[in-house]
Amino acid sequence: MRRLAACVFALSLMLAALGSRPVTATPLTEEQQTAVARRVEIYLRYLFAWGPETGVKVTSMHESAIPGLYSAIVEVNQGERRGQEVVLVSADGRYLVRGDFHDTTEDPFAEVRQTVVLAGHPSKGPADAPVIIVEYGDFQCATCAELYPTMKKLLAERKDVRLVYKDLPLTRIHDWAMAAAVAGQCAFRQSPDAFWRLHDFLFENQKQITKDNLDVRLDALAPLLELRLEEFRTCRTQEATRATVEQSLREATELGLRNTPSLFINARPLAGAQSYDAILHLIEYELYLQKQGSAPR
């Protein structure tokens, strides 16, 4: 109830800002209903990655108890799975209320695109790949280690995907995550390839690594990664290197991230150790969107 009240209050403020007075909504013509329903459908398909295999229908549009808004039922069919949800929508289809307040003329992932910095961070895959996956990870995170083979398989099989890795060491619960993140940055400064080999080593040997043996293992690994050992050691103690990791942490905080792994597939969020199929679905959907040119902007 509080959340609904907050949404209604936010809507009232928006209407006021637009110079609109809350008045009783007049019935929409059939043509208006069709246009609004289509706009809502396009936006929801984009928001939830519903491709052509998912049936989406907006029906039963009528005046709601909230002045200036119409109530509509969104029906969703995915094979044998069916569901429906009541939403509120403005007469022009611009504003949609479903727990959160949405402006259907804006990209719901615009804030992510504006916040995430890709340049200067480890990446793997074609530079011109149409799908970019950003992973915020923690080398000590068990769930990240579970995701690791999935991402490795994905990058081996797909040539239309680029992965950008960003640090999100959860220092409150992981005692060597920050040191590992700093080591990763040091390896990256000498060689992007060395970073990815270190990345693989840390996840593949995560259970054997401790706070006490991390430095010893990193030093022993350096020659195998073709790293200049003294430079690698010095870098791991420098505040400037740690500052790079902390900048990534601030970025993650701005995005509201609290757990790892957290993925963004062309800015679309996906949390946790997702299955190969779940990630592939979003990749295929993004490629479909680009082909159709139908993403709302």
Predicted regions span which residues?
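C-terminal cap of thioredoxin/glutaredoxin-like
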Residues: 26-98, 219-297
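A short, surface-exposed interaction/processing loop segment used at functional sites
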Residues: 91-122
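Sec/Tat signal peptide C-region and signal peptidase I cleavage site
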Residues: 20-25
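Bacterial N-terminal signal peptides
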Residues: 7-19
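A short beta-strand-turn-helix
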Residues: 115-131, 155
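Structural alpha/beta surface segment adjacent to cysteine/selenocysteine redox centers
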Residues: 134-223, 228, 253-258, 285, ...
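Positively charged n-region of N-terminal signal peptides that target proteins for export
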Residues: 1-4
